[in-house]
Amino acid sequence: MERQFRFKAGDRVKIRKDEPTPFAGLEGTIAAIEPHPREVAVLDRYIVVFKWGEKQSFYEAQLTEADTDHA
């Protein structure tokens, strides 16, 4: 059975505002997913690309769906 991920490549996401990162509150796009080798979903990494081209890696719990009213 194929694993289901919360987000997929191309999805718009927002970094949670309560995360201790300089990217908190910013929106980006999922560029890729790096599944955990032992299929531990909470440890999957999501590669997010920001509008200025920078890529950063986040865990699923650090992300929420982006606001779609201004997309």
Locations of the language-model features?
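Basic/aromatic-rich interaction segments and small domains that mediate binding to polyanionic partners
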Residues: E2-H70
